[in-house]
Amino acid sequence: MDYTLTRIDPNGENDRYPLQKQEIVTDPLEKHVYQNVYMGKLEHALHDMVNWGRKNSLWPFNFGLSCCYVEMTTSFTAVHDVARFGSEVIRASPRQADFMVVAGTCFTKMAPVVQRLYDQMLEPKWVISMGACANSGGMYDIYSVVQGVDKFLPVDVYIPGCPPRPEAYMQALLLLQESIGKERRPLSWVVNDQGVYRANMQSERDRKNAERIAVTNLRTPDEI
């Protein structure tokens, strides 16, 4: 599996996160497995254990911009029960949150605030872009709206829709958990190389393209 190496920028030398240097590399643990089977397998097991703990205890940052935030909070109700995925602990401080959900329209005046809040989050951290406005500006193709939060933030998961349903938000959580389970991060802060290896995840459109083309009997709206 191919991995994307993104180096952390602790000194703030890069003005925008998407402009950081990225390389397409292989799994960094594979070479250790071949050099030393025992230590390589042990390190692989440690990474899997740490990733398991991270992906099953994701604390969201309580931050919303527009109507998509209403759909996000709906997933915390008893009907949908997002607590099943370990993401019900809403944090009011970015320093205690694991991932940020940019839900709604991001205006140019709000963009510096969003980026500052993201900078205050501790590593490891992730970003979910929720809704058409956060993904690409939506129907607001005007000077005052940022045409996609990925212009200044590294987005991990995109949720389409205007607004998306709570089920879409929960699916995004599952996709984020799948991505976190394949990450390769330093197991300790006492390390030299602060490289972060993230698996290049295939989009849901491409992954389910063949399955959707093969469908011959379409369901009626009442059956969906």
UniProtKB/Swiss-Prot annotation:
GO terms for cellular component: plasma membrane; respiratory chain complex I. PROSITE patterns: COMPLEX1_20K (PS01150). [4Fe-4S] cluster binds at C67, C68, C133, C162. This is NADH-quinone oxidoreductase subunit B. Keywords: 4Fe-4S, Cell inner membrane, Cell membrane, Iron, Iron-sulfur, Membrane, Metal-binding, NAD, Quinone, Translocase, Transport, Ubiquinone. One of its GO terms (biological process) is aerobic respiration. It catalyses: a quinone + NADH + 5 H(+)(in) = a quinol + NAD(+) + 4 H(+)(out). It is found in: Cell inner membrane. The gene is nuoB. GO terms for molecular function: 4 iron, 4 sulfur cluster binding; iron ion binding; NADH dehydrogenase (ubiquinone) activity; NADH:ubiquinone reductase (non-electrogenic) activity; quinone binding. HAMAP family: NDH1_NuoB. It comes from Erwinia tasmaniensis (strain DSM 17950 / CFBP 7177 / CIP 109463 / NCPPB 4357 / Et1/99). Its EC number is 7.1.1.-.
